[in-house]
Amino acid sequence: MDRQQAERRAAELRELLNRYGYEYYVLDRPSVPDAEYDRLMQELIAIEEQYPELKTSDSPTQRIGGPPLEAFRKVAHRVPMMSLANAFGEGDLRDFDRRVRQEVGEAAYVCELKIDGLAVSVRYEDGYFVQGATRGDGTTGEDITENLKTIRSLPLRLKEPVSLEARGEAFMPKASFLRLNEERKARGEELFANPRNAAAGSLRQLDPKVAASRQLDLFVYGLADAEALGIASHSEALDYLQALGFKVNPERRRCANIDEVIAFVSEWHDKRPQLPYEIDGIVIKVDSFAQQRALGATAKSPRWAIAYKFPAEEVVTTLIGIEVNVGRTGVVTPTAILEPVRVAGTTVQRATLHNEDFIREKDIRIGDAVIIKKAGDIIPEVVGVVVDRRDGDETPFAMPTHCPECESELVRLEGEVALRCLNPNCPAQLRERLIHFASRAAMNIEGLGEKVVTQLFNAGLVRDVADLYCLTKEQLVGLERMGEKSAANLLAAIEASKQNSLERLLFGLGIRYVGAKAAQLLAEHFETMERLERATKEELMAVPEIGEKMADAITAFFAQPEATELLQELRAYGVNMAYKGPKRSAEAPADSAFAGKTVVLTGKLASMSRNEAKEQIERLGGRVTGSVSRSTDLVIAGEDAGSKLEKAQQLGIEIWDESRFLQEINRGKR
């Protein structure tokens, strides 16, 4: 293709990809399968690599993430990003309303969900995104333009050539947060405490490729100077932003009076667990800009807005002890052992203590009355100590200096907060590697859970993953609660795992920094273990989302004689070393019932796991999301389906039972 043809085709591709991205990330209603989007993206990347001068500021390829930055520049906000005064009860809201009415008379309000994320400012010139910044101290923030470009719901070009500055909240959805922490746990990295910290940490990465891998989202909630654009009210501004192509939260309401505001607050206090993202309250703003101007602001916050904060569900219980565990990468993690207590609807007996620094900073002692909450309503964590309840019997805790399993000296590597055991033959690490290898996300060996692995390990029957493939029935039946039938089933599951596709084996090997998603990308790209073993650092970094740190870890792994020996053993036992999945560019069957549809899974499926069902739907061109909305096309309901099924029925969305679901995926295999 000559340059003129390339220029025309690049323009076509940009228009298509920007439209498809808007449908997918903003409207939540994709019109093409993911595979088609990926194919077009790869075509545009190839053109821009051949003709770099054709790359434009609104090109969707800008979302992949550019080279790492040396530091963040400071950005002065043209209009200050003020914080809001807080309200903690109905009385505070009525006091706010009374002050408003005293100044400007009756006023209508706009209520919006207060997203628990990171406030950002985004600036556009002639319709093009030119700069993004954090809130900082309200007058000066940090330039995070390159990281914000990686958020797919943020338009790089608006639908009109206007110049404006919008304000919004970048956040990490619950599903992305759980997935990220699972991947970090698999890599032996410290877990994020909550989705807000994860979002903030992602946007403050100097390497935009890291931000691109984190699946962040963004709602825009206002304009820095809306009246200059001829807009008279906040509700009009939100509608205008939405019309320009921004993602604006649909869960908002214009309220005629404070009673309607209080009803909205009460409604979302009960409904917030159903949301796919975290909120920590409701923002209430006077709707009229003329009234806002009349009310003015204090030095810290506007008088025309207030943030109602939901009370965090925190409970107090006793810290019985602190358990120290060694993970498969050698990271030593302290866990609080608690008197059982109910938090956010579940009984909690264990909670994260993060690391040694956290325990020291909070001065947490065994026997303390400690405050527990669920971080982002997801992970139980100790957030503080009730010092007034100390009676002198509490015991300060010190992290061990030697590994509790192998007694090797623990070390803290440069730049890390965690202590590590560096002994590669540490029994705890060997055991955890076996558990990881057999896990559902890796080799998926049914029946080979933590208890069975521990028995096998303690009996001296296995030391590394290759040993699993030479186990015999006679060895297994000697284990506790392992009869002949159970032994036969386990051996069959081990045998079946030999046929897994490469990405499962690759993830199961536990290479540092290589989570399930990276393993999938590597397997798709290299197709065989042999090619991956021979890959150079540069070839690895050519794979989307594989950065320098991961590439270094992969090359270091394959350079170890122990890794070479292990792979030779696995080959000898007949373990598959090739990628069996569809190429990302593959088309879904034309007659697929899932092609281009947004699907929600709810309840328990008898025939397969949730992840397996998701894989089947995506293989057939569908997209799986975590919550039911008007843009959902189909809900698949298993046993004990709950609120998602009810919402689907209310919205008139098509619902399938498991039998119909199996019918369709089996038809798609023909």
Curated annotation (Swiss-Prot):
<feature type="binding site">
    <location>
        <position position="169"/>
    </location>
    <ligand>
        <name>NAD(+)</name>
    </ligand>
</feature>
<feature type="binding site">
    <location>
        <begin position="34"/>
        <end position="38"/>
    </location>
    <ligand>
        <name>NAD(+)</name>
    </ligand>
</feature>
<feature type="binding site">
    <location>
        <position position="309"/>
    </location>
    <ligand>
        <name>NAD(+)</name>
    </ligand>
</feature>
<keyword id="KW-0479">Metal-binding</keyword>
<keyword id="KW-0436">Ligase</keyword>
<keyword id="KW-0464">Manganese</keyword>
<dbReference type="InterPro" id="IPR012340">
    <property type="entry name" value="NA-bd_OB-fold"/>
</dbReference>
<dbReference type="InterPro" id="IPR010994">
    <property type="entry name" value="RuvA_2-like"/>
</dbReference>
<keyword id="KW-0460">Magnesium</keyword>
<dbReference type="GO" id="GO:0003911">
    <property type="term" value="F:DNA ligase (NAD+) activity"/>
</dbReference>
<dbReference type="GO" id="GO:0006260">
    <property type="term" value="P:DNA replication"/>
</dbReference>
<keyword id="KW-0234">DNA repair</keyword>
<dbReference type="InterPro" id="IPR036420">
    <property type="entry name" value="BRCT_dom_sf"/>
</dbReference>
<dbReference type="Pfam" id="PF03119">
    <property type="entry name" value="DNA_ligase_ZBD"/>
</dbReference>
<protein>
    <recommendedName>
        <fullName>DNA ligase</fullName>
        <ecNumber>6.5.1.2</ecNumber>
    </recommendedName>
</protein>
<keyword id="KW-0235">DNA replication</keyword>
<dbReference type="InterPro" id="IPR003583">
    <property type="entry name" value="Hlx-hairpin-Hlx_DNA-bd_motif"/>
</dbReference>
<dbReference type="GO" id="GO:0046872">
    <property type="term" value="F:metal ion binding"/>
</dbReference>
<dbReference type="InterPro" id="IPR001357">
    <property type="entry name" value="BRCT_dom"/>
</dbReference>
<dbReference type="InterPro" id="IPR033136">
    <property type="entry name" value="DNA_ligase_CS"/>
</dbReference>
<dbReference type="Pfam" id="PF00533">
    <property type="entry name" value="BRCT"/>
</dbReference>
<dbReference type="Pfam" id="PF01653">
    <property type="entry name" value="DNA_ligase_aden"/>
</dbReference>
<dbReference type="InterPro" id="IPR041663">
    <property type="entry name" value="DisA/LigA_HHH"/>
</dbReference>
<feature type="binding site">
    <location>
        <position position="421"/>
    </location>
    <ligand>
        <name>Zn(2+)</name>
    </ligand>
</feature>
<keyword id="KW-0862">Zinc</keyword>
<feature type="active site" description="N6-AMP-lysine intermediate">
    <location>
        <position position="114"/>
    </location>
</feature>
<feature type="binding site">
    <location>
        <position position="406"/>
    </location>
    <ligand>
        <name>Zn(2+)</name>
    </ligand>
</feature>
<dbReference type="InterPro" id="IPR018239">
    <property type="entry name" value="DNA_ligase_AS"/>
</dbReference>
<feature type="binding site">
    <location>
        <position position="112"/>
    </location>
    <ligand>
        <name>NAD(+)</name>
    </ligand>
</feature>
<dbReference type="InterPro" id="IPR004149">
    <property type="entry name" value="Znf_DNAligase_C4"/>
</dbReference>
<dbReference type="InterPro" id="IPR013839">
    <property type="entry name" value="DNAligase_adenylation"/>
</dbReference>
<feature type="domain" description="BRCT">
    <location>
        <begin position="589"/>
        <end position="670"/>
    </location>
</feature>
<dbReference type="InterPro" id="IPR004150">
    <property type="entry name" value="NAD_DNA_ligase_OB"/>
</dbReference>
<feature type="binding site">
    <location>
        <position position="403"/>
    </location>
    <ligand>
        <name>Zn(2+)</name>
    </ligand>
</feature>
<dbReference type="Pfam" id="PF14520">
    <property type="entry name" value="HHH_5"/>
</dbReference>
<keyword id="KW-0520">NAD</keyword>
<comment type="function">
    <text>DNA ligase that catalyzes the formation of phosphodiester linkages between 5'-phosphoryl and 3'-hydroxyl groups in double-stranded DNA using NAD as a coenzyme and as the energy source for the reaction. It is essential for DNA replication and repair of damaged DNA.</text>
</comment>
<dbReference type="GO" id="GO:0005829">
    <property type="term" value="C:cytosol"/>
</dbReference>
<feature type="binding site">
    <location>
        <position position="285"/>
    </location>
    <ligand>
        <name>NAD(+)</name>
    </ligand>
</feature>
<dbReference type="InterPro" id="IPR013840">
    <property type="entry name" value="DNAligase_N"/>
</dbReference>
<feature type="binding site">
    <location>
        <position position="426"/>
    </location>
    <ligand>
        <name>Zn(2+)</name>
    </ligand>
</feature>
<comment type="similarity">
    <text>Belongs to the NAD-dependent DNA ligase family. LigA subfamily.</text>
</comment>
